Amino acid sequence: MLRVGNLTVDVQGSRVLRGISFEVKAGELVYLVGRNGAGKTTSLRTIMGFRKPAAGSIITFESVNLIGLRPYRIARLGIGFAPEESEVFGELTVAENIALPTWTHPQTREAEARIERVYRVFPQLERYRARGGHALSGGERKMVSIARALALGPKLLLLDEPTEGLSPVIVPAIIQGLANIRTFGHAVFIAESNIHHVPDFADRLYVIERGEIVFAGAPELAARDPAVARIVGGTAPGGSGAAIEAPPAV
């Protein structure tokens, strides 16, 4: 699905990513965790073609190398992206915001079915279809942003800090949505700064520090890794601090 190998990225003369490697297999939910400035967002933006790497490879979908492709071509290959600061248009309704990427595509029954499926990812949005974007809370805006990234039915979804700045009350709803996304067969790769927001049902966890991968493995193994504890603090997933369990699928 996605194999990143020896990825090296320089930004304004500084080395931000130092030969990192990771993979996301079909249908997996994989996390990249690290402190602010560790290189998480740069990793996602490089995959999407917004940054050009100094070295390395990004291989996906039948051995296609994404390096050198423009963002719109990468999106057409079946990769969706919801950045941390995703814009929700206040003058559009929730339904219009979500369907926005489809406006330049044929309106087929299959396309309509994909949109309807989005509302099963976040059922909370169903009753807000006609609400204007300007009237949404921060958590609702985040749901709309993720839902919009799903509108074209990507095979792989990249999410940058989907729980950043959200109330602890709304975080479980976002986590539930991630579980729902996976039931529809999408692979998901998430950059996250708070390791306590990594659910127990995640398939794999990478920890990045100063542009280098310092841990790769099952989330429950991170609890026993001293390097992870030093970087992220507290109890890692699988330990006594892991309060988010696998929710029921829809």
Residue map of PLM features:
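Helix-to-loop junction immediately C-terminal to a conserved catalytic motif
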Residues: 48
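ABC ATPase C-loop
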Residues: 149-150
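Conserved ABC transporter NBD signature motif
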Residues: 56-65, 77, 110-115
